């Protein structure tokens, strides 16, 4: 995971704890979770749109592009 070991992750968590305090951590985690959920949703929507665009390509274009390869 990003080339970080266990010690580095523990150090980062301790620094976050010192900066924000124990009371703010649940709020930060909740916000981070929501942000990641929205990011994954947007990513899947983009993938679906790209797949639809590829699937909607007429057969002639697919054949001509595969013949060029």
Curated annotation (Swiss-Prot):
A GO cellular component annotated for this chain's UniProt record is: TAT protein transport complex
Q: Which GO terms describe its molecular function?
A: protein transmembrane transporter activity
Arranged from A to Z, the UniProt key words for this protein are: Cell inner membrane, Cell membrane, Membrane, Protein transport, Translocation, Transmembrane, Transmembrane helix, Transport
Could you say which protein family the record assigns here?
Belongs to the TatA/E family.
From the UniProt entry, list the residue stretches annotated as the region Disordered: 48-69
**Corresponding gene?**
tatA
Main localization of the protein described in the UniProt heading: membrane
Per its UniProt record, what HAMAP family does this chain match?
A: TatA_E (MF_00236)
Q: State how it assembles.
A: Forms a complex with TatC.
List the transmembrane segments.
1-21
Function text: Part of the twin-arginine translocation (Tat) system that transports large folded proteins containing a characteristic twin-arginine motif in their signal peptide across membranes. TatA could form the protein-conducting channel of the Tat system.
| GO biological process, alphabetically ordered | protein transport by the Tat complex
Cell location: Cell inner membrane
| Entry-linked InterPro entries | TatA/B/E, TatA/E
The question of whether Cell membrane is a record keyword is answered with yes
Q: Keyword Thylakoid: yes or no? A: no
What protein name does the entry list?
Sec-independent protein translocase protein TatA
Q: How does it sit in the membrane?
A: Single-pass membrane protein
Per its UniProt record, what Pfam families does this chain match? TatA_B_E (PF02416)
């Amino acid at each position: 995971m990003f080339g970080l070991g266990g010690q580095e992750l523990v150090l980062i968590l301790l620094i976050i704890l010192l900066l924000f305090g124990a009371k703010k951590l649940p709020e930060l985690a909740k916000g981070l979770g929501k942000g990641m959920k929205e990011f994954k949703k947007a990513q899947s929507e983009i993938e679906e749109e790209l797949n639809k665009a590829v699937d909607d390509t007429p057969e002639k274009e697919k054949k001509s592009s595969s013949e060029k390869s």
